[in-house]
Amino acid sequence: MADGRNLEKVKELAAYRVSEEIYVEEMDSRAMVLEHIKSGARIFLMSNEDENKVFYIGFRTPPDDSTGLPHILEHSVLEGSDKFPVKDPFVELVKGSLNTFLNAMTYPDKTVYPVASCNDKDFQNLMDVYLDGVLHPAIYREPKIFLQEGWHYELESPEDELTINGVVYNEMKGAFSSPESVLDRFTRNVLFPDTTYSNESGGDPAVIPQLTYEKFIAFHRNYYHPANSYIYLYGDMDMAQKLTWLDQEYLGHYDRKDCHADSAIATQQPFEQPVQREITYSVTEEEGTKDRTYLSISTVVGTDLEPVLYVAFQILEYTLINAPGATLKQALIDAGIGQDILGGYDCGILQPYFS
């Protein structure tokens, strides 16, 4: 049984305001939603006896173009910080920490930085490195981080052609070479033409070179603020101690500001009639074009704030497409409609959709 006393001490912390507290029976966890009063940061705690402790901080990072700014920033903030001025602290943590999970992910509308460890001292250090990275990154004094992770020109000799290089630029060239990936991204862009989802948060290689260092810095200054963040703590730990440390080392140094108007995600209004679009992708001469056509049918399904609908479509996705011998998938294959049937329920954005 999760120890409720762990969260009783949290209620006594003057730096925080508790807005909700519940017991989650399925996970034997006591959960609490809080707000850091000075900075406006939101925190969700799940206290239980799981020794695998989890922390993440996430920011709403809606892109207004397809330069891949959120993705490049995700790479860049873990390239050194004020407190940890080493070249690549992320790699050092991969090699030298006791982490059970360590990553950073860019989504179409948010960027998250999760870590986990069973060792409390190691867990505390992981939190420190990640928080200093996202809030106090070296990008302000080291423009070369942007050039390395984003894009830059290269010229080996005067006789060579000018080329473009960069970690994210090359990564997204690879992503855009996959027809399934191209179709998935294009589907989302077409379904939500009037919202941030019409842009490619990961970056379109054709557009990435339009990103400037000045816009890159402005994006971090605007969105990477505690008031635009959500912090998550899970597992067997002294929650009051962790929150006190968060306040003293990081959150308490920030004043609340209104980030929500800029980072708010607009809702796409329904189309008056079904929309059809076509897109092409590259193939080699050896591959040819025979049997290389893809067809996708997608529909928006409510919002991610509807838990019953969410569960229903998770079940439908498994039953119709992903289960062994799934009925819809097998029927389509038997009818000769396609060589293979892919699909599913994408529920990682404000308006989930089924394809």
How does the language model describe each region?
Residues A2-A14, P62, S66, S76-P270, ...:
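Charge-rich, well-structured scaffold segments of protease-associated domains
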Residues A31, G40-I43, V54, D184-F186, ...:
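Short glycine-rich loop/turn motifs
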Residues A31-I37, V275-E285:
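Short acidic-hydrophobic surface loop/beta-edge motif
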Residues A2-E49:
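N- or domain-start disorder-to-order transition segments that initiate the globular core
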